Amino acid sequence: MLPPMYLSAPETALPGTGVDNDEVIARVRKAFRGKADEWIPIEQSIRYVFDRCNSKVRYLETDTTLSPGEFAAQAAAACLAANGVAATDLDLLVYGGIARDAFEPATAAEVAGRLGARPLHVLDVTCACAGLIEALHVVAGYFALHDEIRTALVCAGEITRDRVTYDIQSLEDVAVDVAGLTLGNAAAAFLVTREPLPGGGARIVGMTHKTLSENWALCRAPVDGHFESKSKELFALGIHVPPEIRRLLDRAGWSAEDVAHYAFHQPSEASVEKVLAELGARPQAGVFTHSLFGNTATTSWVLALDHRLKQGAVHNGDKIVLASAAAGFTIVSAAAVWEDA
């Protein structure tokens, strides 16, 4: 049984540098070593993907000394301040991001140390772009097992740096490397508590997880290489997403039209539109932020929810679905009801 869980309004952080499509293509052109006529189809293919995804700008961190943990701590500190919670009030801190600059210690320990949170439980959850929603499952487990744990913080700091390659020399390279050109950097954090928060929050009413592990090799970010994604094959697996969302809705006792806000992972605008159409969701319920931030990995759905909240469009009693499809191939989701203070 799911323990009582309330998700705070999130806080997010972006690098100061926005990079548009023309700048990204200029970087690829600079690295290109082929003939001029060989460049034309490569550029056309990249622009086609950008148009299909509705990629326009992504924010890329230029400070090479900023660690993912420090980046996450920026969003975490803002989240604590916004919700009037002291770092010393935290009982559990989970880092759910992909980016990390060390195998040990846990990046969560760095975030906690930078915040001055102690003593507490800290751990990392790694589940590709599904990490932050999967972290909710972990928090639910801790809440169920440990009565003394009352307040958790979940965070991520996604920085790509040299994990994205601009060394694209052929159409074959485009096929596996172009997804990396849509990636942006962002940090995000939110609180999970047993009791309602003074500033309001989302009461979690259900969660799901499914991994189709036979597809594990389609998308990888190796420890000693750059991000590669067989995007055509990966997006084809999107047919498995609507059934998982329906399973979540059935658990919550909702219909697709009952949901006021779908805050999904944002690999492309077209993929989100396709899922929402298949579900029969209200058109205005979809949140689209890929054009604003790019694909920011684990933090994408958080930026989408934050964007909708800052628009003042979330009201008491609104039903919300959070979801991410990720490398693995993993599909995770959570259903929540927004409750004002």
Where are these regions (language model features)?
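Condensing-enzyme catalytic core mediating Claisen C-C bond formation in acyl metabolism
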Residues: 1-65, 166-236, 325, 337-341
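Buried hydrophobic positions in well-ordered alpha/beta secondary-structure cores of metabolic enzymes
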Residues: 7, 49, 79, 90-93, ...
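Short beta-strand segments
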Residues: 8-11, 96, 126, 152-158, ...
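Acidic-glycine-rich active-site phosphate/pyrophosphate-binding loop
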Residues: 46-49, 102-116, 156-169, 216-217, ...
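Active-site pocket-shaping loop/turn-to-helix segments
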Residues: 56-74, 123-130, 179-181, 222-243, ...
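Claisen-condensing/thiolase-fold acyl-transfer catalytic domains that form or cleave C-C bonds
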Residues: 73, 99-101, 110-113, 117-118, ...
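Phosphate/pyrophosphate-binding loops at sites that engage ATP/ADP/AMP, CoA/4′-phosphopantetheine
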Residues: 75-91, 243-260, 279, 308, ...
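Flexible, glycine-rich active-site loops centered on histidine and acidic residues
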Residues: 144-182
